[in-house]
């Protein structure tokens, strides 16, 4: 085999691989904004206090209902509407993950982003028909968004040099926290000024425009890129020359099921999505019930955790690649470090939120820290599958996401039931359940996680020259 050396001078941030990371970053912002905006608009959409048969309204109130249609949905129906997006995501994970190992993902991602955006435009008229039609739209939106979030991982198998994986993936994944930040920040103002339907129209139009840019700018393989410099092409190709090519090959399912390092990743993905979904979905509700603020202030306060989470995600990417490139820590040590920070720190802060939040400021601080420190996982278990089985990364990412989404679906539904049945101690039950899951899964990860390619992922390999 020919020994190819890495080019001495390689384009850094101003390069096409970082351009791809930024483009995916914006895609993730949009799909998360489309997903999360309902968490806040629900406060404006639903009449929680006035029975529907009362009609003693002023002209101003009737005009406001034209701008802000109010629906009489019970707490159980609201929980179904909020969680229905995860039903769609469950359906699509494994098919897209399997296809990402054998087929180019750029068309699937672009089409799915466009579909999610069109469905966002349809939610306000669907709400006028009834909650059932909104649930249908959200399920279909979940299918489209699941294709975007899962399919993008297969792209990095061809584009991310090993020593830049933390940086590139954290830049991309940080869009998942910037999306809620933007959605919650602006949705309150839009609801107040223009009415809640405009939230869905604005994010839907932005997504449609971005999908057009996606089709114009993205190329699936760096070797086929017409404008990329030869030095960057050589750098990416040389960095990945020992990586197993992920074409159509049989999946070693039996070996995967016996792999403790893989189960460590799966369990912590479950814990991460359980925690993340609980906090993302119910932060506006927690703020509304504990701090008693209006919808605009709620949006501002709910968005704060995601600004800090965005910063934490970017910092984590820089730190992890620094520790690896300087050979300060091994790959497995870096993954365990950032998994611990991302899974255990939120536990500490939700417990503080329950027992040490004596006033408005302490509540906001602990809630912000609980949400934001989850982002350290971006450089932990969330990309660990790329270390242990790059050939099957797309498929494994889909499987871990599928099991994680079940956690998100269960956590959001269960939290709604607990809030409905036991309002006084609901937050204690929800947060302690989250803490127990996180600590158990983290302990398993610290015992069994690995950072090198596993034997079952090396079988019948074909080296890329």
Curated annotation (Swiss-Prot):
Keywords: Cell membrane, Glycoprotein, Ion transport, Membrane, Sodium, Sodium transport, Symport, Transmembrane, Transmembrane helix, Transport. Belongs to the major facilitator superfamily. Sodium/anion cotransporter family. NCBIfam families: 2A0114euk. GO terms for biological process: phosphate ion transmembrane transport; sodium-dependent phosphate transport; urate metabolic process; urate transport. Glycans are attached at residues 39, 47, 56. PROSITE patterns: MFS. InterPro entries: MFS, MFS_dom, MFS_Na/Anion_cotransporter, MFS_trans_sf, Pi_cotranspt. It comes from the Eukaryota. The chain crosses the membrane at residues 79-99, 117-137, 176-196, 199-219, 260-280, 299-319, 337-357, 363-383, 399-419, 431-451. The keyword Transmembrane applies. It is found in: Apical cell membrane. It catalyses: 3 Na(+)(out) + phosphate(out) = 3 Na(+)(in) + phosphate(in); urate(out) = urate(in). Its main location: membrane. It comes from Rattus norvegicus (Rat). One of its GO terms (molecular function) is sodium:phosphate symporter activity. It is a multi-pass membrane protein. Disulfide bonds: none annotated. This is Sodium-dependent phosphate transport protein 1. The keyword Heme does not apply. GO terms for cellular component: apical plasma membrane. The lineage of its organism: Eukaryota, Metazoa, Chordata, Craniata, Vertebrata. Important for the resorption of phosphate by the kidney. May be involved in actively transporting phosphate into cells via Na(+) cotransport in the renal brush border membrane. Plays a role in urate transport in the kidney.
């Amino acid at each position: 085999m020919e020994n190819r050396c890495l080019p001495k001078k390689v384009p850094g941030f101003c390069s096409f691989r970082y351009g791809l990371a930024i483009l995916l970053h914006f895609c993730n912002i949009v799909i998360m904004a489309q997903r999360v905006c309902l968490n806040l608009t629900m406060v404006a959409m639903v009449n929680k206090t006035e029975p529907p048969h009362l009609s003693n309204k002023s002209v101003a109130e009737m005009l406001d209902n034209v701008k802000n249609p109010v629906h009489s949905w019970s707490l159980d129906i609201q929980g179904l509407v909020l969680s229905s997006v995860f039903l769609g995501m469950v359906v699509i994970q494994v098919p897209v993950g399997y296809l990402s190992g054998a087929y180019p993902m750029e068309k699937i991602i672009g089409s799915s982003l466009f579909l999610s955006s069109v469905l966002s435009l349809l939610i306000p008229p669907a709400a006028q028909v009834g909650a059932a039609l909104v649930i249908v739209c959200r399920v279909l939106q979940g299918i489209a968004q699941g294709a975007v979030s899962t399919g993008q991982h297969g792209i990095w198998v061809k584009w991310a040099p090993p020593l830049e994986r933390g940086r590139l993936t954290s830049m991309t994944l940080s869009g998942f926290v910037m999306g809620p930040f933007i959605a919650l920040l602006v949705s309150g103002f839009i609801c107040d000024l223009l009415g809640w339907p405009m939230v869905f129209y604005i994010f839907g139009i932005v997504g449609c425009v971005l999908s057009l840019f996606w089709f114009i700018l993205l190329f699936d393989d760096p070797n086929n890129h017409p404008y990329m410099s030869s030095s960057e092409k050589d750098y990416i190709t040389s960095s990945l020359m020992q990586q197993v090519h992920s074409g159509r090959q049989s999946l070693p399912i039996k070996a995967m099921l016996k792999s403790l390092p893989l189960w460590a990743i799966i369990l912590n993905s479950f814990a991460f999505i359980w925690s993340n979904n609980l906090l993302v979905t119910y932060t506006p509700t927690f703020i509304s019930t504990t701090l008693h603020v209006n919808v605009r202030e709620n949006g501002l306060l709910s968005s704060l955790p995601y600004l800090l989470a965005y910063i934490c995600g970017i910092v984590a990417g820089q730190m992890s690649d620094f520790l690896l490139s300087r050979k300060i820590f091994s790959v497995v040590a870096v993954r365990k470090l950032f998994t611990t920070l991302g899974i255990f720190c939120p536990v500490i802060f939700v417990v503080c939120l329950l027992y040490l939040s004596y006033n408005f400021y302490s509540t906001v601080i602990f809630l912000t820290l609980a949400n934001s420190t989850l982002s350290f996982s971006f450089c932990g278990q969330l990309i660990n599958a790329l270390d242990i089985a790059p050939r099957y990364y797309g498929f494994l990412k889909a499987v871990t996401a599928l099991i994680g989404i079940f956690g998100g679906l269960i956590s959001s539904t269960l939290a709604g039931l607990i809030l409905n049945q036991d309002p006084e101690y609901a937050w204690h039950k929800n947060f302690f359940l989250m803490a127990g899951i996180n600590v158990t899964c983290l302990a398993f990860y610290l015992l069994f996680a690995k950072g090198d390619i596993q034997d079952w992922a090396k079988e019948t390999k074909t080296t890329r020259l």
